[in-house]
């Protein structure tokens, strides 16, 4: 039985010239700005033009592009290996055809083996859904598994990506059974992976004082939450499970939210305000980006460059995103297997 796992993620500009069209695609999404056309179109044009220069400066600091695609490719490779790891049926090999830009082929697997191939589909920049569905259709799987790389479900991320895939899959005639994994905020391996990383950095931070652990999640407008979006509740549940797993007596911790844009009210407290509070209290900070599973501008620039300057030298311990952490890959593989 052939299975296609499609990793759904945000995407990011692959060059400075891609910054404005990337921003336009983001703000033109009806799940981001819920206005009818042509109003949404013209507003997306206006916002992307207005924000382009600042966004370009951000990406200039990290090599002129977003690293999210490269990071997601590594995750796809690791997941594909894990899903096919124990399948060895015959020493003969099967040819899978030419390598495609937006999927990672498995080389030489037994003719009678179950084959799973992992594809990458980005929402706002290449590889787009209309590109990836062609590769999936050519692969001709018996089953498609949609796996968003957003731990906590939100209509602005998870649902947007799923709807976009479904629209293109229907257009290109993908008719096989499709299963959807909507979140993994409470997955045991996901929780344990974070707990292990916190423990390591907490010990380092303890050398200069009693640390405060900040769980930093991408913020959302309160208007989205008030409509029933479960994102904030799932962030809180993720953190509660991690704190419980840590078994650290009298742990000082807080949830905070980053990357707010625009004048409307967003989830609070902000990561910046919590860092300022930690500075005033004179405590070292262990910061975990809880809603990100790969590095991009919000972690590499916002957390590592801008916010780091708030805290005294030697008092800031930023935990890396899970990326290809073995427990995280195990988490993703388990989600695929249990949904099969």
UniProtKB/Swiss-Prot annotation:
* Keyword Lyase appears in the UniProt entry: yes
Recorded GO cellular component terms are: cytoplasm
Q: The organism's lineage? A: Bacteria, Pseudomonadati, Pseudomonadota, Alphaproteobacteria, Rickettsiales
Location in the cell reads: Cytoplasm
Question: HAMAP family recorded for this chain?
Answer: Ferrochelatase
Give the Gene3D superfamilies listed for this entry. 3.40.50.1400
Principal location listed in the UniProt entry: cytoplasm
Purpose: Catalyzes the ferrous insertion into protoporphyrin IX.
Q: Which GO terms describe its molecular function?
A: ferrochelatase activity; metal ion binding
Assigned EC number: 4.98.1.1
* A Pfam family hit: Ferrochelatase
| Name listed for the protein in its UniProt record | Ferrochelatase
Per UniProt, Fe cation binds at 218, 298
What's its catalytic activity? Answer: heme b + 2 H(+) = protoporphyrin IX + Fe(2+)
Q: Which domain of life is it from?
A: Bacteria
What's an example Gene Ontology biological process for this entry?
Answer: heme biosynthetic process
The family assignment reads: Belongs to the ferrochelatase family.
Q: In which pathway does it act?
A: Porphyrin-containing compound metabolism; protoheme biosynthesis; protoheme from protoporphyrin-IX: step 1/1
Keywords of this protein's UniProt record, alphabetized?
Cytoplasm, Heme biosynthesis, Iron, Lyase, Metal-binding, Porphyrin biosynthesis
Write down the InterPro entries for this protein, in alphabetical order: Ferrochelatase, Ferrochelatase_AS, Ferrochelatase_C, Ferrochelatase_N
């Amino acid at each position: 039985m052939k299975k296609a796992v499609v990793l759904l993620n945000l995407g990011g500009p692959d060059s400075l010239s891609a910054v404005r069209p990337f921003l336009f695609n983001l703000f033109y999404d009806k799940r981001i700005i819920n206005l009818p056309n042509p109003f949404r179109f013209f507003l997306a044009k206006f916002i992307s033009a207005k924000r382009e220069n600042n966004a370009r400066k951000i990406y200039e600091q990290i090599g002129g592009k977003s690293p999210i695609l490269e990071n997601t490719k590594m995750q796809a490779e690791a997941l594909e290996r894990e899903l096919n790891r124990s399948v060895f049926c015959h020493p003969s090999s099967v040819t899978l055809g030419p390598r495609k830009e937006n999927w990672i082929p498995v080389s030489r697997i037994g003719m009678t083996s179950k084959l799973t191939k992992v594809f990458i589909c980005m929402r706002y920049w290449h590889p787009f859904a209309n590109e990836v569905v062609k590769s999936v259709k050519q692969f001709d799987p018996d089953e498609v598994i949609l796996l968003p790389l957003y731990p906590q479900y939100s209509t602005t991320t998870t649902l947007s990506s799923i709807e976009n895939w479904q629209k293109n899959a229907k257009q290109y005639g993908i008719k096989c059974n499709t299963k959807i994994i909507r979140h993994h905020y409470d997955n045991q391996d996901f929780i344990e992976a974070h707990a292990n990383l916190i423990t390591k950095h907490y010990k380092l931070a303890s050398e200069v004082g009693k640390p405060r652990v900040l769980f930093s999640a991408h913020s959302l407008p309160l208007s989205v939450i008030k409509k029933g979006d479960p994102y904030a509740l799932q962030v809180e549940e993720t953190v509660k499970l991690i704190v419980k797993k840590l078994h650290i007596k009298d742990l000082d911790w807080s949830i905070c939210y980053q990357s707010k844009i625009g004048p409307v009210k967003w989830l609070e407290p902000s990561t910046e305000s919590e860092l300022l509070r930690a500075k005033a209290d004179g405590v070292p900070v262990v910061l975990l980006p809880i809603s990100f599973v790969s590095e991009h501008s919000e972690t590499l620039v916002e957390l590592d460059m801008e916010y780091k300057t708030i805290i005294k030298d030697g008092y800031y311990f930023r935990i890396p995103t899970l990326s290809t952490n073995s427990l995280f890959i195990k988490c993703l593989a388990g989600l695929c297997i249990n949904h099969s």
